[in-house]
Structure formats: structure tokens, C-alpha cells
């Protein structure tokens, strides 16, 4: 039987920052004591774009009492928690690569879910593998069977089945090659389809 996300040692969690409860730590401008505050509006065409063109404040002030909301910059996949009814996809992931982000830390607003690995960092192969799964029609259909609403729930994501470790890494390596082939500008629509990558790697 395939592992679930959680059984394989991964976990989707919801962004820690609820804005109205953290007003004193929300900032409009970058300062020495601030880090990026990521919102769902930072998810754009499969990537995290920061700063985004938005009317929302995008910085978070780090103090002793707010450090619990801070995450060290690392590879992850972000996922919008709320989607519009008319949107075609409930699962809208964004690949986040630590080496491509100019900050050592970040935090996330609670309209985002993101992936962690318990006790260690997520590897490049793993993060590309998860991005491919989340972008696939297979996972989209499966998730809709779990949840018919427009909300994407982290607890339900953690029950999703994933391939064995070696297969997940194979998926990730294939996606990495495709990403590199397409260059810097890539979206779910112009890369080899995620479902085709899964067919190649799983059969």
C-alpha cells in the first residue's frame, strides 16, 4: 500500500500568521527587523513571487514574542488554502526553492498551506516531486473526492497517498530536467504535463 504524506514523514501545515491577531508585527516596508510575509497573492504561475503587486502588507516584524511564527528558508511547496468556486483547480501549488530566495527566513499568512519534512530539510528531488503531484490531474481528482468545498485543508492533504521514496525522487528528477529545459519561465501549462511525468515514472 502507498504511504500517505504524513506516514512518509512529510506534513502540510497552515501559515502561522493570522493578520488581525498580529497587527503590531505587520509592516508595509522592508526594514532590518522584518522578513517576508507570504500570502496567497504571492502564488503566481507555479512560483512564489515576492514582493507581489498587492495592497496587502508583505513584511513581518521579528521580535522575541513573534519568533514562533518564523520559518527558516528552505525548499517547500506552498498551496493556496482558499480558491474561488469558478476556478478549475482546487490544488494551486507554488514551488519554493531556498537557493532562489533572497531571505534567510520567512513566515506565511494563514491563507497558505506549505510542506515540511519532520526532522530534516526537503531535498530538491522531493520538492519537485511534490510539486508535480500537486500539479497533476490525478491528485486534483483525488483531493476533490476527499473535499468538495473550495477550501484546501492541510489535514486532508496529509492523508493523500504518495509513491514510495525512490519513485518520488524519480518523479522529482524528471520534473527538474523538464524545468531546466524550459528555462526560467515555466508554468503548469508549458512544461511536460505532470500527469505525463507520473506515467513515465510510475507506469
Predicted segments, located by residue:
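Acidic, Ser/Thr-rich low-complexity intrinsically disordered segments
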Residues: 184-185, 203
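Polybasic, glycine- and aromatic-enriched phosphate-binding surface used to engage nucleic acids
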Residues: 1-181, 191-200
Amino acid at each position: 500500500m502507498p504511504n500517505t504524506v504524513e506516514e512518509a514523514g512529510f506534513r502540510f501545515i497552515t501559515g502561522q500568521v493570522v493578520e488581525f491577531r498580529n497587527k503590531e508585527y505587520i509592516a508595509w516596508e522592508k526594514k532590518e527587523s522584518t522578513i517576508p510575509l507570504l500570502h496567497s497573492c504571492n502564488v503566481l504561475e507555479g512560483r512564489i513571487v515576492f514582493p507581489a503587486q498587492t495592497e496587502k502588507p508583505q513584511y513581518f516584524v521579528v521580535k522575541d514574542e513573534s519568533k514562533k511564527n518564523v520559518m527558516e528558508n528552505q525548499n517547500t511547496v506552498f498551496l493556496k488554502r482558499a480558491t474561488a468556486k469558478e476556478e478549475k483547480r482546487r490544488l494551486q501549488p507554488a514551488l519554493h526553492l531556498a537557493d532562489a530566495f533572497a531571505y534567510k527566513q520567512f513566515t506565511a499568512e494563514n491563507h497558505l498551506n506549505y510542506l515540511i519534512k519532520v526532522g530534516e530539510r526537503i531535498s530538491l528531488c522531493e520538492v519537485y516531486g511534490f510539486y508535480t503531484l500537486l500539479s497533476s490531474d490525478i491528485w486534483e481528482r483525488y483531493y476533490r473526492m476527499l473535499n468538495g468545498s473550495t477550501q484546501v485543508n492541510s489535514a486532508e492533504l496529509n492523508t493523500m497517498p504518495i509513491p514510495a521514496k525512490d519513485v518520488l525522487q524519480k518523479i522529482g528528477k524528471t520534473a527538474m530536467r523538464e524545468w531546466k529545459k524550459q528555462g526560467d519561465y515555466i508554468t503548469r501549462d508549458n512544461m511536460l504535463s505532470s500527469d505525463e511525468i507520473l506515467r513515465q515514472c510510475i507506469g
